[in-house]
Amino acid sequence: MPKRRDILAIVLIVLPWTLLVTVWHQSTIAPLLTTHKGEPLTDSRREAAPGADPREYCMSDRDIVEVVRTEYVYTRPPPWSDTLPTIHVVTPTYSRPVQKAELTRMANTLLHVPNLHWLVVEDAPRRTPLTARLLRDTGLNYTHLHVETPRNYKLRGDARDPRIPRGTMQRNLALRWLRETFPRNSSQPGVVYFADDDNTYSLELFEEMRSTRRVSVWPVAFVGGLRYEAPRVNGAGKVVGWKTVFDPHRPFAIDMAGFAVNLRLILQRSQAYFKLRGVKGGYQESSLLRELVTLNDLEPKAANCTKILVWHTRTEKPVLVNEGKKGFTDPTVEI
């Protein structure tokens, strides 16, 4: 009996202390568990058990959201709309090492524009196979023309007389094609835009110009030795001048990429062409626009000419010194 009483006494003494320690331990840990449960678990707080499958660890982590993969199928070019005006993009081009690269990049932009017709005019005695294949493969609606700039307007090789801006005859041929294709009193809604193959174009630009009533205008970046040139617009939303350093008193001190013309205006003013002779540098745009509109007729786009949507970029001329006179690489491989 004495031994049993000793054991009972020990149990009665130890048991309360055991219960007390257990309760205290749980009350200390519980707040920590509650806090961690509501917080994202970082790698420093939670690590996979040694030898555990990493995939199982990721699957059990509630903070990792499973990505649902969806396949998108696009139609390029977009389906033709019977309600949208057609944008006729006139692009002069000429043979050079980067020609295919320039046209490919531009085509990849135009493929996203609905109701677009690409008028590509080569400075060549005939249509070249390179350009013909490229246009055919794009899937775009296009017309392929050619006219060679006369030799007397060329200095030597690829250089040109600065009095004859590159692309003048090619743009004029495109204007003639439009007038021969559409009747003068055509009700066909459309816009004509002169887009060189080395520029960079925002898709937003094409939607801005689509509503052109007569002639719309906007800024162009990297021209005239400035970050950008732009029409000067007053508080009433009218063009009153030009933000440019080079000859700001020109009738239309604007870059070729900075305006679009309503197709009906092109058809009605059949005398309006880019002047080939007697035009100073920088006046090529004015030679056409002064036959179409006055300053007061211009429609500022791109948030009243405060947004840049086109950049006058230039591709760096490739260095091909290792080709040698005979050519190191296979000349039959098209680049």
Curated annotation (Swiss-Prot):
The gene is B3GAT1. The keyword Transmembrane applies. InterPro entries: Glyco_trans_43, Nucleotide-diphossugar_trans. This is Galactosylgalactosylxylosylprotein 3-beta-glucuronosyltransferase 1. Its main location: Golgi. It comes from Canis lupus familiaris (Dog). UDP-alpha-D-glucuronate binds at P92, T93, Y94, D123, R166, R171, D196, D197, D198, H312, T313, R314. Belongs to the glycosyltransferase 43 family. It is found in: Golgi apparatus membrane; Secreted. Homodimer. Interacts with SAR1A. Pathway: Protein modification; protein glycosylation. Involved in the biosynthesis of L2/HNK-1 carbohydrate epitope on glycoproteins. Can also play a role in glycosaminoglycan biosynthesis. Substrates include asialo-orosomucoid (ASOR), asialo-fetuin, and asialo-neural cell adhesion molecule. Requires sphingomyelin for activity: stearoyl-sphingomyelin was the most effective, followed by palmitoyl-sphingomyelin and lignoceroyl-sphingomyelin. Activity was demonstrated only for sphingomyelin with a saturated fatty acid and not for that with an unsaturated fatty acid, regardless of the length of the acyl group.
